[in-house]
């Protein structure tokens, strides 16, 4: 992210700031060249010059504050706040599904509501969009490693995100539904989308923003 924009958002006062908050899927991990192929960059091209899209993804980030890499303790959390976004797109939860991080839906809900409240409190009056995690194509096993992403837990998280969106009257972009029948998007490692997958996510976000 260009820090000139982060620390001086008023230089672009006539643009609509879109903060893409998330983990490695938002960041564009495994994509080459990452900055050109990640979904926030594709979204920027679709939205055009009236918008400034910031990629604030953090590889390995969890939504839960007790996770092994809480998003709320990252530099990009601070940068996304200083960006003064008009729109915030939240896509977290994949890394929360790991055995070492998952404490159940109640803990997840509490931290999710806190994150929503944080962005709602910004002077830019951000409109918040929730996103469900992408489908994981890793095979769950009887005795998974503690650091293994779990699709069964991701399904729990997806239901909770949809429920929170309904209760908070927030739009929700269901990326889990978008990707559940597309294993070809995740051929490299079963978790991170390839360029086609990133493009599909960008298109889905674009349609939601233009709705």
Question: Across the structure, where does each feature detected by a protein language model lie?
Answer:
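A short, compositionally biased domain-edge/stem linker segment
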Residues: 1-10
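Short alpha-helical interface patches
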Residues: 8, 20, 27, 176-180
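Alpha-helical cap/lid subdomain in secreted, periplasmic
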Residues: 12, 71-211
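Short hydrophobic segments within beta-strands
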Residues: 21-22, 131
């Amino acid at each position: 992210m260009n820090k000139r924009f982060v620390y001086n958002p008023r230089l672009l006062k006539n643009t609509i700031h879109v903060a893409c908050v998330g983990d490695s899927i938002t960041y564009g991990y495994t994509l080459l060249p990452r900055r050109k192929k990640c979904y926030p960059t594709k979204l920027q091209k679709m939205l055009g010059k009236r918008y400034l899209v910031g990629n604030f993804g953090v590889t390995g980030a969890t939504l839960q504050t007790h996770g092994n890499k809480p998003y709320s303790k990252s530099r990009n959390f601070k940068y996304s706040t200083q960006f003064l976004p008009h729109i915030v797109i939240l896509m977290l939860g994949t890394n929360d599904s790991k055995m070492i991080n998952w404490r159940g839906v109640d803990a997840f809900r509490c931290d999710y509501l806190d994150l929503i409240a944080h962005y709602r409190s910004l002077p830019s009056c951000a409109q918040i969009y929730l996103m469900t995690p992408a489908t994981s194509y890793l095979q769950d096993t009887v005795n998974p490693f503690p650091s293994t992403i779990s699709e069964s837990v991701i399904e729990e998280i997806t239901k909770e995100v949809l429920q929170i969106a309904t209760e908070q009257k927030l739009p929700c972009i269901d990326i889990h539904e978008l990707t559940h029948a597309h294993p070809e998007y995740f051929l490299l490692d079963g978790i991170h989308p390839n360029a086609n997958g990133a493009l599909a996510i960008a298109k889905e976000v674009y349609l939601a923003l233009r709705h």
